[in-house]
Amino acid sequence: DIADVITGKAKDFIIKHKDEPFFMYMGTQDVHVPRVPHARFAGKSGMGTRGDVILQLDWTVGEIMNTLDSLNLADNTIFVFCSDNGPVIDDGYQDQALELLNGHTPMKQYRGGKYSAYEAGTRIPFIVRWPAGIQPCKQQALFSMIDVYASLAALLNHPLTPATVAPASRDQLATFLGKDNTGCDYVVQQNLNNTLSIIQGTWKYIEPSDKPAVEHWTKMELGNDPKPQLYNISIDPSEKNNVAATHPEMVKELSTLLEQVKAGKNQGTK
């Protein structure tokens, strides 16, 4: 009954605060652990326990949306649905996740997955719904979860002072609202072993690392390599072709930028 309890508490919170502005963060265990689908969903997906809890998550989101609708709050409520990392299939649990995929490809064409520096590890779903302020659209802009903080502060005309408040968060409100399809000038990412990568424009650089290439439990490629890695993700989203050797000038540019970010000397212009 975990999902039912969490969903019930969320709905109660919304009802309690329906007459005033409110912020609610709701996390779910469904696509993490424990994966325990309610009897309403157990065996219904045809994809085992993992598929069943995804159905349960879908129900949970629907319950929250229905509550907002019933209170006439949906049009002027900002609703964000996102994840903290990319997918993992076999993470050590005996739930037949691999055997029952039935052709489903959680990573699509992207390399790696959860824990990884590659795109399937850091590229996540990010859905924003706000009928009163956002026209439906699909964005390919570069955007970081870290920037949600400063972007919402900008929406509220709330200055982030002192400068020590969320210093890495940048105002990306135009992108958040679907009005800018460019987004950040760069985004820094980190894998399980603290190996950093940086994306700027169409280029992605992963710093050299002597950490393990594969996570032993999940058999996931981590993106660690003793040599620098450079990918043009606009034409090579699967990160199959490391072009660091043929584009040394771009390796130098992005590695220098990454070192500046590490040293706190470059927070980006947007």
Residue ranges and their predicted role:
Residues P21-G27, I54, V61, I78-S83, ...:
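Beta-strand elements within well-structured catalytic alpha/beta cores of enzymes
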Residues I89-A117, G133-A141, M145-Q229, I233, ...:
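C-terminal cap/loop subdomain of S1 sulfatases and analogous C-terminal strand-loop tails that border
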Residues Y25-P34, F81-I89, A168, V187-N193, ...:
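Short, solvent-exposed turn/loop segments enriched in Gly/Ser/Thr/Pro and often Arg
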Residues D236:
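Intrinsically disordered, low-complexity polar regions and short flexible loop motifs
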Residues H17-M24, L73-F79, R123-I124, N181-D185, ...:
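Loop/turn elements at helix/coil->beta-strand transitions in domains of secreted/extracellular proteins
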Residues A10-V53, V88-D90, Q94-A97, T269:
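Active-site His/acidic residue clusters
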Residues P34-P37, G43-M47, N66, S70-G133, ...:
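Histidine-centered active-site microenvironments of extracellular/periplasmic hydrolases
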Residues D1, V5-I14, R40-T77, L101:
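A long, amphipathic alpha-helix that forms part
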